């Protein structure tokens, strides 16, 4: 799986992952502000929410 792996303020980067999912994490009240992206599907703590997907570069 190829996932985007950059933090919000950094240039776009990708990473080849062994996990079968990618994620993007954002603040629940501001879905347009994505704080980070990466491999897997971690559990988020309030006020963050994780959105996971299966597909190359699906966490845009």
UniProtKB/Swiss-Prot annotation:
Record localization: Secreted
Tissues of expression: Expressed by the venom gland.
Domain of life: Eukaryota
InterPro entries with a match to the protein in the record: Snake_3FTx, Snake_toxin-like_sf, Snake_toxin_con_site, Toxin_cobra-type
Cellular-component GO terms for this entry: extracellular region
GO molecular function: calcium channel regulator activity; toxin activity
UniProt KW NADP keyword: no
Physiological role: Specific blocker of the voltage-dependent L-type calcium channel (Cav1/CACNA1). Inhibits cardiac contractions.
Name of the protein in question: Toxin FS-2
Organism: Dendroaspis polylepis polylepis
């Amino acid at each position: 799986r190829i996932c985007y792996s950059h933090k919000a303020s950094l240039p776009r980067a990708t990473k080849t992952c062994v996990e079968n999912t990618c994620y993007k994490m954002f603040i629940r009240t501001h879905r347009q502000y994505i704080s980070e992206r990466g491999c897997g599907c971690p559990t988020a703590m309030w006020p963050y929410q994780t959105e996971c997907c299966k597909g190359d570069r699906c966490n845009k």
